């Protein structure tokens, strides 16, 4: 099967140097899902266009013309440019830490190359919202993303009715089954009390701007992030541990 040219958007997940001037880039594309591309000549001197390598930083959203052959594991990019030019994510240490957490979480969930345009648009929109977010929204953003991403992988906890849980007394979220109840699960994989109540509140957040109203302290966010990592490990095969999580826990004070 010969290669054909296609125009697609993509989110950069990983970039690895190759040879003297090239990179191999893992990109989640709108048209083809998870793909790897060889990009030549982007690491030469700045005078010769070396700055092009900056376009392939993790979380970058690109507009591309790509060669595609479904039988090849490594294709090539003919043209590329930023689809959205970030104002803060690539330069602000805290927003960059959140973005890298989101990139790693998505990468760990993607096991097959199949396209999912809804997942692509959800993720791209999330990065753009993060770039524009206030400090409070940014601090809660990893929790929001971690709870809403699972809808695309079949294990998201259902939205509880607003006000369904008036207090946190004896409230549990079963991380294995993904359900809330007032009965303690018969296994150790659950969160309870305020953690379960706040999780229910976060699940009802439909627009990131609503995160402004959820006031949490640094330690509580860290506890929830740890619990959500366990949640993913229970549902995603070979999930392992998040390398970006320790950095994120320290930065989001």
List the model feature ranges, each with a label.
Residues 1-253:
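Non-catalytic alpha-helical scaffolds and adjoining flexible linkers that form interface surfaces
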């Amino acid at each position: 099967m010969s290669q054909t040219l296609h125009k697609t958007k993509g989110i950069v997940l990983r970039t690895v140097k190759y040879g003297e001037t090239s990179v191999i880039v893992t990109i989640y594309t709108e048209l083809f899902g998870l793909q790897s591309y060889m990009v030549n000549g982007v690491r030469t001197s700045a005078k010769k266009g070396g700055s092009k390598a900056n376009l392939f930083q993790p979380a970058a959203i690109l507009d591309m013309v790509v060669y595609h052959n479904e039988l090849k594991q490594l294709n090539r990019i003919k043209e590329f440019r930023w689809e959205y030019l970030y104002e803060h994510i690539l330069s602000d240490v805290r927003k960059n830490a959140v973005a890298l957490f989101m990139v790693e979480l998505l990468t760990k969930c993607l096991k097959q190359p199949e396209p999912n345009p809804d997942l692509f648009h959800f993720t791209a929109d999330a990065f753009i919202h993060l770039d524009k977010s206030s400090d409070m929204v940014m601090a809660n953003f990893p929790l929001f993303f971690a709870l809403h991403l699972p809808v695309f992988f079949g294990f998201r906890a259902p939205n509880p009715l607003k006000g369904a849980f008036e207090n946190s007394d004896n409230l549990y979220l079963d991380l294995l089954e993904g359900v809330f109840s007032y009965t303690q699960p018969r296994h150790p994989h659950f969160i309870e009390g305020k953690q379960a109540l706040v999780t229910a509140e976060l699940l009802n957040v439909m627009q990131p701007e609503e995160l402004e109203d959820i006031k949490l302290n640094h330690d509580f966010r860290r506890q929830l992030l740890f619990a959500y990592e366990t949640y993913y490990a229970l549902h995603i095969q070979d999930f392992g541990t998040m390398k970006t999580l320790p950095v994120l826990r320290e930065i989001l004070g």
